[in-house]
From Swiss-Prot:
This is 3-isopropylmalate dehydratase large subunit. Pathway: Amino-acid biosynthesis; L-leucine biosynthesis; L-leucine from 3-methyl-2-oxobutanoate: step 2/4. Catalyzes the isomerization between 2-isopropylmalate and 3-isopropylmalate, via the formation of 2-isopropylmaleate. The lineage of its organism: Bacteria, Pseudomonadati, Pseudomonadota, Gammaproteobacteria, Alteromonadales. One of its GO terms (biological process) is L-leucine biosynthetic process. It holds the Pfam family Aconitase. Its cofactor is [4Fe-4S] cluster. Belongs to the aconitase/IPM isomerase family. LeuC type 1 subfamily. Its EC number is 4.2.1.33.
Length: 468
């Protein structure tokens, strides 16, 4: 087929405002998501220059990174956190931006509340001053993180200069086996191509295993596209997408809905479209995954062992492995199921949606958190929290000894009062296991919600495909 285009190319082409020869094209931004950490300087820049927002109705703000998951009171925040949330509130008031503050029933992690409110739509360009903006690509949107200076530029112009990325197709063929989740799929992908395997690319995830995922699962996969170095991750919209969006607050209604769906159905990669790179995996080969090191690419199956750097031919990779093992406090050859933990975190923009909490609750129900283990469950938004409580999931967790918290980014990053102490070893459903990510000297192992809950009750990592 001549002129065949990929999903990314179609969305990109539809948003070019100007493409001066020899310069980066200018693209239009449909939705701009804002939070308290990366926006203060951007708003200050506008005030200094005397500029207004170009499109305040296309800008949506929430408080998530620094908020407390124990209390909705400003008094629960550190002085710096309080300054940031109060500054965001004032900036939103001054510039006419819709804000979901800590008292709003829909407040939550920006990448959880955006989709559930229908702010995220197929074929749109979405930006946010946050690296995990790729999450929204699950809807067939082109979504990526931007820096604070770019946040200011989008606020002022609703556009952005961007170089076009290369295209990569990651096809996960066939179907996963029981116990294998979207988190396991994306960790397996990162383990295969490495944390820089997607650098310079926008990745389209496809194949039967991806198509079979719910929207929550697709968001988990796209969320971690950045962890393989990609600019963004995308999944073509389909009936699963449309069913999820129907009736949501900011989704089209009535005749506009029918017209939108007709357009969205055309936003898919054409037959014969050429990708710059192709990666293929067999879903049946993917087992529950567990990171052993200090980046998401240092990952193995739960029935595996901590790898031995001596078997790595590349000197640079070998040195990285040795450094990771020293920090993480593990010995090569240790079975993954022999690794004990003392902390569990179920939450983050990767895995804090209702499907994630249901999955974790299956392993918590009728059990008790192991002695010496502290486990917290942090729903991704007010909507998720309310739905989970309506389903009785909170009671399952609380009766098992988990702490049930308020929405927020929480222990994903050591930016609020939920953090690990030096030497703590945590089973975490978040997206990064870097040195110190969850607190100075903390040791993080990335897993699915089901694996995290199972580790909480066992006191060590277990293969959830087997009795434990």
């Amino acid at each position: 087929m001549t002129n065949a285009k990929t999903l990314y190319q179609k969305v990109w082409d539809a948003h070019i405002v100007a493409a001066p020869e020899g310069e980066a094209p200018v693209i239009y931004v449909d939705r701009h998501l804002v939070h308290e950490v990366t926006s203060p300087q951007a708003f200050s820049g506008l005030k200094v220059a005397g500029r207004k927002l170009r499109a305040p109705e296309k800008t949506f703000a929430t408080m998530d990174h620094n908020t407390s998951t124990r209390s909705a009171s400003l008094d629960a925040l550190s002085p710096m956190a309080r300054t940031q949330v109060e500054t965001l509130a004032q900036n939103c008031k001054d510039f006419g931006v819709r804000l979901y503050d800590i008292h709003h029933p829909n407040q939550g992690i920006v990448h959880v509340m955006g989709p559930e409110l229908g702010i995220t739509l197929p074929g749109t360009v979405i930006v946010c001053g946050d690296s995990h903006t790729a999450t929204h690509g699950a809807f067939g949107a082109l979504a990526f993180g931007i820096g604070t200076s770019e946040v200011e530029h989008v606020l002022a112009t609703q556009t952005l200069r961007q170089l076009k990325a290369k295209t990569m197709k990651i096809e996960v063929r066939g179907h996963v086996t029981d116990g294998v989740t979207a988190k396991d799929i994306v960790l397996a992908i990162i383990g295969k191509i490495g944390m820089d395997g997607g650098t310079g690319y926008v990745v389209e995830f496809c194949g039967e295993a991806i198509e079979a995922l719910s929207m929550e699962g697709r968001m988990t996969v796209c969320n971690m596209a950045i962890e393989m170095g990609a600019k963004a991750g995308m999944v073509a919209p389909d009936q699963t997408t449309f069913d999820y969006l129907a009736g949501r607050e900011f989704a089209p209604k009535g005749e506009d809905w029918a017209e939108a769906v007709a357009y969205w159905k055309a936003i898919k990669t054409d037959d014969g479209a050429v990708f710059d790179a192709i990666v293929e995996l067999d879903a049946a080969d993917i087992a529950p995954q567990l990171t052993w090191g200090t980046n998401p690419g240092q990952v193995v199956a739960i029935d595996g062992k901590v790898p031995d750097p001596i078997n790595e031919a590349n000197p640079s990779t070998r040195a990285s492995m040795e450094k990771a093992l020293e920090y993480i406090g593990l010995s090569a050859g240790t079975p993954m199921t022999d690794i004990s933990i003392n902390k569990v975190f179920i939450g983050s923009c990767t895995n804090s949606r209702i499907e994630d909490l249901r999955s974790a609750a299956v392993h918590a129900k009728g059990r008790k958190v192991a002695s010496g283990v502290t486990a917290i469950v942090v729903p991704g938004s007010g909507q998720v929290k309310a739905q989970a409580e309506a389903e009785g999931l909170d009671k399952i967790f609380i009766e098992a000894g988990f702490e049930w918290r308020l929405p927020g980014c929480s222990m994903c990053l050591a930016m609020n009062d939920d953090r690990l102490e030096a030497g703590d070893r945590c089973a975490s459903t978040s997206n990064r296991n870097f040195e110190g990510r969850q607190g100075r000297g903390s040791r993080t192992h990335l897993v699915s919600p089901a694996m995290a809950a199972a580790a909480a009750v066992a006191g060590h990592f277990v293969d959830i495909r087997k009795p434990y």
